[in-house]
Amino acid sequence: MLYDFLKRTLDIIGSLFGIVILGLIFPFIAFAVKLSSPGPIFADVPKRSGKDGKSFKMYKFRSMIKDAHLLLQSDPKFKKLYEEYKKNSYKLSHDPRVTPVGHFIRKTSIDELPQFINVLKGEMSLVGPRAYYPDELINQQKAYPETKKYVKTLLTAKPGLTGPWQVSGRSDISFEKRVKLDASYAKKRSILYDLKIIILTIPALLSQKGAV
């Protein structure tokens, strides 16, 4: 299929360019992350759901304290926070686990630059649906049964470094709206639509709307 060939070509070119940029800033970001709090440079987070539900490890610079995801689910002092996390579409507007450096790299989306590696490996695309956590999809579909058809559709496409959710408010939009947008993208995806989203991503990143 011509679209698949062109999209993969665009992904390879774009990811190689992104990896060059990543290589230039990596020493500085790595130093800042390590200086901000003890722990690894890359986030140690659960795997994400990729195309057809296949799980993969998504690379991100660590923006939180070490073992942040494990602590959220197991530490008693985070119990109320975990309930808020699930209720708020697996996002927190004021997350005490985020480090000072983490706030900056999340606001500027620098933490997501390592995902160019996922794109080059073919696990992600430059443009696509959000990369959801498997338990997020399970729990949210239980809470909102009407979203099941959208989840099924969005999983037919590779998750993206950017996508309709990125240019439509990011964390400001609900799970229901997010999966509708992602399913709509999966249905009408095209190279022109991908290029449009890439262009719209620039002002979205500059505005930092919905970034937490």
Regions found by a protein language model. Give the residues of each.
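A hydrophobic, helix-centered structural microdomain
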Residues: 1-71, 187-212
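Positions in alpha-helical segments
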Residues: 15, 44, 99-103, 181
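Glycosyltransferase donor-binding loop in the core domain
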Residues: 20, 105-108, 156
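Hydrophobic structural segments characteristic of membrane proteins
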Residues: 41, 114-212
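Short, glycine-rich, amphipathic interfacial segments at transmembrane boundaries or analogous
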Residues: 41-96, 162-176
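Structured, soluble extracytoplasmic/luminal domains of envelope-associated proteins
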Residues: 95-127
